[in-house]
């Protein structure tokens, strides 16, 4: 699944499906960003998404919070 921090994908028309988010915890063995991406992908897949756009990250003492918009190509 494509994950980008822009609000568009070149040469693609998009249908917005909803906001998805993920959390990566600093004290786990898995990488924080990878963990957050995996959680977002699961939510987006459940919505039938092809990609997640406009992804934003918030870093904290205990990990990372990521949120973006799940979209379907039309």
PLM features: residue spans?
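Short, well-ordered alpha-helical segments
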Residues: 15-57
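C-terminal edge-of-domain segments
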Residues: 62-74
């Amino acid at each position: 699944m494509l994950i980008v921090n822009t609000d568009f994908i070149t040469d693609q028309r998009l249908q917005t499906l909803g906001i998805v988010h993920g959390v990566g915890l600093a004290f786990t063995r898995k990488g924080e960003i990878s963990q957050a991406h995996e959680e977002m992908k699961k939510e987006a897949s459940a919505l039938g998404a092809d990609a997640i756009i406009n992804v934003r990250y918030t870093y904290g003492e205990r990990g990372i919070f990521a949120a973006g918009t799940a979209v379907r190509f039309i």
